[in-house]
Amino acid sequence: VTDSLKKALAAVEAALEKKAYDLVVLQVGHLSSIADFFIVATGRSDVQVQAISRGIEERMEREKERPTAIEGIKRGHWVVLDYNDVVIHVFFEPAREFYRLERNWTDAQEVALPEPYRSQVRDLTLRAIG
């Protein structure tokens, strides 16, 4: 397991602790120099999106990881937490449906997460990203 994947799993765990849902972890390192992994998660309100984002930030801080940038936390519709090799997108549900970020990364491989994470991960066969 790479350091990038460990970092991604820590972020996933933190997001789930704050009741994020519809999580997708995409391996994008072979497609882009931006990051190794993108994580996309959803919250049911702007307040929950903020709580998920802060939870991730706190967890990463405990792991001695510092963000390069955090954008959008004040509004809570689309928060981006950039940890260099792991970039996390936390969306308010309507914003995620509007932007459909995953459609830009159809060539990316979705990371099969172990339980207990898997039960909250979006099933690609049920997702319409067209």
Q: For each predicted feature, which ranges?
A:
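Short hydrophobic/aromatic beta-strand micro-patches
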Residues: V40-T42
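Long, contiguous binding/interaction regions
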Residues: V1-H30, V47-A51, E58, E71-G72, ...
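P-loop NTPase catalytic core of nucleic-acid-dependent motor ATPases
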Residues: S33
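Active-site beta-strand termini and strand-to-loop segments that position acidic
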Residues: L81-Y83
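Active-site phosphate-binding and catalytic loops of NTP-dependent enzymes
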Residues: R62-I70
